[in-house]
C-alpha cells in the first residue's frame, strides 16, 4: 500500500506511537518502523509516498535527507534543483516530530522554505565542485548542510567518496536539514495530534 501525503497525515493522527522504540544509535530505525506502522513498505524508492516524502525526527535535531554519494553526478552536471534527487525528495515533505522521550508532537509540511533550501543546495553544490576535500558545510540560509554520515564496515573501514578518480572525502557524507530549521518547523508549523491519538 502506498499513501499520499494527506492520507499519511490523517493516518498519523490516529496512530498509537507508544509501540515505537526510542531511536538510539541508528536514528533511521524509527522512520522505518513508522513506515511499517503506516503500511508503507521500506524500499529504495526516491520518495516514501505517492506525492512526497516522510521524514521523522526528534525536535531540535537535524534531519537526514539523503546520502551525498548518489547525488554527485547531478551536482557536477549542474542539474537544476527541481530536477535533482534532493529537490524532488524535499519539495513535498511531511515532517513527523517527536520529543526526546519518543512522544509524537505532530506533523508539518513546510513548502514555503523550498526556495531557501534551493539556495542552500546551490551554495553546497558550488562548494562541492570547488573543494579538494569535503568538510561540514552549511548553505548561507542555514537550512541545508552536508556533513559526515558513515559507519565502519566489518573490517573497520569507512566508505570514502571518490569523484573522477580522486578521493574527495575519506568518509561518507549526507545532506541534512539543520537542527535549527527542524526546531523552527516544530515550534511554528506542527499540526498537533488529536486527543484520540494521545
Regions found by a protein language model. Name each.
Residues 1-28, 32, 36-39, 43:
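N-terminal, Lys/Arg-enriched amphipathic/low-complexity engagement segments
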Residues 144-145, 152-166, 171, 179:
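Phospho-regulatory, Ser/Thr- and acidic-rich intrinsically disordered linkers and terminal tails
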Residues 42, 50-56:
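Conserved catalytic cores of phosphodiester-cleaving nucleases, focusing on short active-site segments
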Residues 173-175, 184-186:
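Long terminal regulatory regions of eukaryotic proteins
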Residues 188-194:
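Conserved small/polar residues in nucleotide/adenosyl-binding loops
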Residues 59-83:
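Mg2+/Mn2+-dependent nuclease catalytic core
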Residues 85-153:
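Acidic, metal/cofactor-coordinating or nucleic-acid-engaging core segments within structured domains
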Residues 198:
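Gly/Pro- and small hydrophobic-enriched strand-loop and loop-to-helix capping segments
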Amino acid at each position: 500500500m502506498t499513501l499520499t501525503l494527506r492520507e499519511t497525515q490523517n493516518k498519523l493522527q490516529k496512530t498509537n506511537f507508544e509501540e515505537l522504540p526510542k531511536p538510539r544509535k541508528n536514528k533511521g530505525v524509527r522512520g522505518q518502523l513508522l513506515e511499517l506502522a503506516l503500511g508503507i513498505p521500506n524500499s529504495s524508492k526516491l520518495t516514501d509516498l505517492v506525492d512526497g516524502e516522510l521524514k521523522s525526527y526528534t525536535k531540535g535535531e537535524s534531519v537526514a535527507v539523503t546520502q551525498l554519494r548518489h547525488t554527485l553526478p547531478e551536482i557536477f552536471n549542474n542539474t537544476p534543483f527541481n530536477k535533482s534527487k534532493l529537490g524532488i525528495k524535499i519539495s513535498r515533505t511531511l515532517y513527523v516530530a517527536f520529543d526526546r522521550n519518543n512522544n509524537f508532537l505532530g506533523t508539518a509540511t513546510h513548502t514555503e522554505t523550498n526556495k531557501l533550501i534551493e539556495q542552500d543546495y546551490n551554495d553546497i553544490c558550488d562548494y562541492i565542485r570547488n573543494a579538494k576535500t569535503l568538510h561540514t558545510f552549511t548553505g548561507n540560509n542555514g537550512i541545508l548542510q552536508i556533513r559526515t554520515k558513515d559507519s565502519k564496515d566489518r573490517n573497520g573501514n569507512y566508505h570514502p567518496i571518490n569523484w573522477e578518480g580522486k578521493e574527495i572525502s575519506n568518509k561518507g557524507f549526507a545532506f541534512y536539514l539543520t537542527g535549527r530549521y527542524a526546531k523552527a518547523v516544530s515550534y511554528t508549523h506542527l499540526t498537533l495530534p488529536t486527543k484520540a491519538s494521545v
